[in-house]
Amino acid sequence: MAQHFDFEKPILELEQKIAELQEFSKEKDINLSPEISKLMRRLVRLRKEIYGNLEPWQKVQIARHMERPNFYDYAPLLFEDFMEFKGDRLFADDKAIVGGIAIFQGIPVTVVSHIKGRGTKENIQRNFGMPHPEGYRKALRLMDQAEKFHRPILTFIDTPGAACDLEAEERGQGEAIARCLQAMAGYSVPIICTVIGEGGSGGALALGVGNKVLLLENSFYSVIAPESCASILWKDPGKAKEAASALKFTAQDLLELGIADGIIKEPLGGAHRSVERTAEEMKKTIAEALAELRELPPDELRTMRYEKLMNYGEFEEKA
């Protein structure tokens, strides 16, 4: 069953009206082409009006859409010869992180991504895209390998956050995330991070220390989920919509703040409308960024990442 949101209701009603007219025209053999064409033009305008003026909370809804493409959907459209590697060589294979090696535009690369499931059963297997420490250690193993063999690193971010259960804490969740941050800051190879859905807290940042940070048009990247923010600030998770506006976490906000380096255009309505078109835009943007970064020496790549991190946020000292 397709998932639709309240703000899409006018579009759905008009689509249904057009479908009914087309069916009626066919059944009764009546030419209703002028009326149908008029409604089609109105539908195009309505889609542009609604999807071109989405509020932050509406973008959150699209980023979480049950049919939103994940890494496995994009991989065959972005890469050749993707070979997945599993396990952290210490404890287990975390299914909320996927990674391996591939060919991107003729260049060998290492790719690492969060991944959610399709449906309840797979989401439980993948812990709804929330990695445990072994997931981040798997990512670190793959990125260390990329450094050893001088392969660029491409990460894809889509997680509500890191797993926060007792088992995750017992196995060193904070340490695992910190190791990823430390390692990514010091690598000599280009790193491009792309937020393809949710970018939640330290669980996202663990794959987010890059020379270039790109966001899909309807994705978001935040220190906290809007529901959690509302619970803390107003003791009311129902105020998530207000929190979403206050957090300034949309792709457009982050580009203005200098946290994002680019926005990847999505089809009207979201990436789930056409994974092929979204992947095409993604491939073009990543290829341009990679071509630029491959011209830079290792020291400059490290300095670039360090300065990017140090410029996140603002603070002022008061006596």
UniProtKB/Swiss-Prot annotation:
InterPro entries associated with the record: Acetyl_CoA_COase_a_su (IPR001095), ClpP/crotonase-like_dom_sf (IPR029045), COA_CT_C (IPR011763)
Cell compartment(s), UniProt: Cytoplasm
Organism expressing this protein natively: Desulfitobacterium hafniense (strain Y51)
Gene Ontology terms for molecular function: acetyl-CoA carboxylase activity; ATP binding; carboxyl- or carbamoyltransferase activity
Domain of life: Bacteria
Family label: Belongs to the AccA family.
HAMAP family reported for this sequence: AcetylCoA_CT_alpha
Pathway involvement of the protein, from the record: Lipid metabolism; malonyl-CoA biosynthesis; malonyl-CoA from acetyl-CoA: step 1/1
Family annotation (NCBIfam families): accA (TIGR00513), AccA_sub (NF041504), PRK05724.1 (NF004344)
Catalyses which reaction(s): N(6)-carboxybiotinyl-L-lysyl-[protein] + acetyl-CoA = N(6)-biotinyl-L-lysyl-[protein] + malonyl-CoA
Keyword Lipid biosynthesis in record: yes
Assembly and interaction partners: Acetyl-CoA carboxylase is a heterohexamer composed of biotin carboxyl carrier protein (AccB), biotin carboxylase (AccC) and two subunits each of ACCase subunit alpha (AccA) and ACCase subunit beta (AccD).
This protein's name: Acetyl-coenzyme A carboxylase carboxyl transferase subunit alpha
Pfam families named in the record: ACCA
SUPFAM superfamilies assigned to the protein according to its UniProt record, in alphabetical order: ClpP/crotonase
